[in-house]
Amino acid sequence: MEEAHLLPAADVLRRFSVTAEGGLSPAQVTRARERYGPNELPTEEGKSLWELVLEQFEDLLVRILLLAALVSFVLACFEEGEETTTAFVEPLVIVLILVANAVVGVWQERNAENAIEALKEYEPEMGKVIRSDRKGVQRIRARDIVPGDIVEVAVGDKVPADLRLIEIKSTTLRVDQSILTGESVSVTKHTDAIPDPRAVNQDKKNMLFSGTNIASGKAVGVAVATGLHTELGKIRNQMASVEPERTPLQQKLDEFGRQLSRAISVICMAVWVINIGHFADPAHGGSWLRGAVYYFKIAVALAVAAIPEGLPAVITTCLALGTRRMARKNAIVRSLPSVETLGCTSVICSDKTGTLTTNQMSVCRMFVVAEAEAGTCRLHEFTISGTTYAPEGEVRQGEQPVRCGKFDGLVELATICALCNDSALDYNEAKGVYEKVGEATETALTCLVEKMNVFDTDLQALSRVERAGACNAVIKQLMRKEFTLEFSRDRKSMSVYCTPTRPGLVAQGSKMFVKGAPESVIERCSSVRVGSRTVPLNTTSREQILAKVRDWGSGSDTLRCLALATRDAPPRKEAMQLDDCSKFVQYETDLTFVGCVGMLDPPRPEVASCIARCRQAGIRVVMITGDNKGTAVAICRRLGILEDTEDVVGKAYTGREFDDLSPEQQRHACRTARCFARVEPAHKSRIVENLQSFNEVTAMTGDGVNDAPALKKAEIGIAMGSGTAVAKSAAEMVLSDDNFASIVAAVEEGRAIYSNMKQFIRYLISSNVGEVVCIFLTAILGLPEALIPVQLLWVNLVTDGLPATALGFNPPDLDIMEKRPRNPREALISGWLFFRYLAIGVYVGLATVAAATWWFLYDAEGPQVTFYQLRNFLKCSEDNPLFTGTDCEVFESRFPTTMALSVLVTTEMCNALNSVSENQSLLRMPPWLNPWLLAAVAMSMALHFLILLVPPLPLIFQVTPLSGRQWVVVLQISLPVILLDEALKYLSRKHVDEEKGRQ
């Protein structure tokens, strides 16, 4: 029943053919259950283990590797001689890599919290209903409640369905509905109809929503929605309809996989076709089929060379290291790929309460009356420092600190704050912070009393736990609270009846202390306290006090003001009718105005500078809040989201104003707005959709159940550490300190990670280009294999993998937060950069082939054959006069492949040292700026020597130890790559500078 809030309670009952006293009949319950189903959220069917495993093989790069492993395995089955064992190493290694990758992927999926399932924690197990089959209230399972049921709720209960209130059985009914609406304080409810068909959930004060908690009071309501039809159920449907999108990095790697598969197919086919003329060479026994299979093996080796097998592992490691660095900055990343996405963030949509502000209500101003004579009224105004619940701060008058005990008015004000209060401060020793116990507004008053210390209590020797309530305790020793007249909507105030506890104070008699909305309280005041005197409240004083309250409540401050007053001679408590709340306003009359306090949820001190950094980095910050527009705009101005004098037309919208716009106007509003106030969950999702239509990468914060759909829809969903389990499980990142500054630090880390990722991806790809050039060149020229597949796997996975991972530790550029967000569709490698890494790769390939060729042609320990003989080595036989005096087995020696492998590894280590910076010279950014890289290079070289020297590794990798002379040649061939890359960097710097000059 969508319109329940519009109708009087009696009309709602008639719609369901039910009475508040009798409830539904068994027949009505049966019909309703058949029509609406059980009152529960359906369980989401999870993926089976088999489905999860198959998902891990959807990546194109993984499928290419799987195909290569399959072909290698088939070819290994046909090997003969000593190569039979080693031939199976390659497919085995590839399969082990894929299995490990799949295990990690499935484990992560299995351990990820399910956001939709987490919603079920807000479903109560039991409910209290009135039905005609039994007298009085009966407890039933919450899932059995149906629309039309008469439901009773009381303090501490979780609301079991969406209810339209029909009767409040206590003075007030307050509900904590923060999980649904994001409101930081509990909300007072009533039973009156709300004639507004467009009211948002925050304004539906006659409704109780499923999953929210009763903070105080007792009430009866009629269930108007159950299960998926509740507001909680609608959120579940929104979340279920959100399809997860692949991150920019995943999309780029997919595209890279597609390009790689096409390139591999073309190159492998070309190698095989080019060598058709060699299929029947004597080396293949004259068999055309054996020759075809031989060159097919070379094509497979080429495929293995072209695939950067270590890339997935290196990327995962780099992202994992990034998450650890982010965790140290209070940003806990739940989804690895989102680390890189943070670097693209162009819009941050942030909650106000707790993220941009401290969510710790603080009194920052107060006043008492200094003089109130005929025609004049002068106020003593004070400011109070401190933005948290910590009882630490100064009270100042102007610029001077004051001792509050010197002002009689402040002593009485502190007394009212301490006694007209049901909340307290508590020191959480585990967290090391002061926390509220009770209402935020009242806790702010408790904290104010501690800061004022009107009786000059000695606080030095107290522990933090004792300090939390020391000054309040002193006041409570002087007066005893007898009872409380709860807050009500009609009088907008609450009061306490107190009697003195000390003999010296008994003569003063009992007092009533009142706090509430200034207009309402001052209207009932007949006098005003000036120091210790009581002076009649004249019209001038009344107007001046109200003008000051209006001034504090508007403009740049928008403080929440509370008036504090005393009734010096209240009726005797025996004469008061406490069970009739309509009489409360009569008891709270003839009041004496004491003072006023102004409080706010203060902005976090560090946020303004972070927003300035975002602006410098080209990131737009948008505040989205459930608060009213005036408060939201004021906070935006204080933080620098809006300029002090900036016109808010087209920059700030309420949810209703946003709804009034056409779809095209809404899109435009999302592109220009800085503030959205009084919004509902659906608004957040629409804002994200509109921003995504402009290709903006959006980070969205949230903490309530209501935020989960938008968190799931945004590229980066950011949940608060203090938020609900639903929000956390729908988000990619959780802020352990709920602080906006941590988001900015995470964005900076994301940019640095992407910059480093580009370096190691290009480093790995240039290595693969070198391997492809090497195999392609040997195949075209008809030379013996310089590298075999198992060696290529070793280089791609291990010797290249370590430096590539270490490149993830490169220091970030100093100007990283001075650049605009990069386009998420920007290619990893394009244009000039592609040429640079192609040039390096071609050099690596040529150097590798040159090393193997040098051993055949020039090494004193080699055969010293001619280049012509080398190109025709497949025709070598005892009968061929071209090879007279040459042992044909020399062409199967391990020395040339060892030379080639050593040059490949050494060249790649030089290439890694060159990758500390994309464009800066080694002289400007030397390798020791990244000590991890130096360690990785040393480790890779050590592993290379390991496979050369330690049995049985030389047999597996088909290598052998080299002589000192041979190592000198390896270095001579490898080191020039540094000079080549330095030259390319120089050209790149000139190219970049010219581009900047043109811009």
UniProtKB/Swiss-Prot annotation:
Instruction: Quote the Gene3D superfamilies the UniProt record gives.
Output: Calcium-transporting ATPase, cytoplasmic domain N, Calcium-transporting ATPase, cytoplasmic transduction domain A, Calcium-transporting ATPase, transmembrane domain, HAD superfamily/HAD-like
Which of this chain's residues are annotated to bind ATP?
353, 442, 489, 515, 560, 625-627, 678, 684, 706
Q: What is this protein called?
A: Sarcoplasmic/endoplasmic reticulum calcium ATPase 3
> Organism, per UniProt?
Sus scrofa (Pig)
Subunit (UniProt): Interacts with sarcolipin (SLN). Interacts with phospholamban (PLN). Interacts with myoregulin (MRLN). Interacts with DWORF. Interacts with VMP1. Interacts with TUNAR; the interaction occurs at low levels in low glucose conditions and is increased by high glucose levels.
Domain of life the protein comes from: Eukaryota
The modified positions for Phosphoserine read 17, 25, 662
For this chain, the annotated S-S bridges are: 876-888
Tell me which tissues or organs this protein is expressed in.
Expressed in endothelial tissues.
Cellular component, GO, one term: sarcoplasmic reticulum membrane
What EC number(s) does the entry state?
A: 7.2.2.10
User: Which residues are Mg(2+)-binding?
Assistant: 351, 353, 703
Spell out where the chain crosses the membrane: 49-69, 90-110, 254-273, 296-313, 758-777, 788-808, 829-851, 898-917, 931-949, 965-985
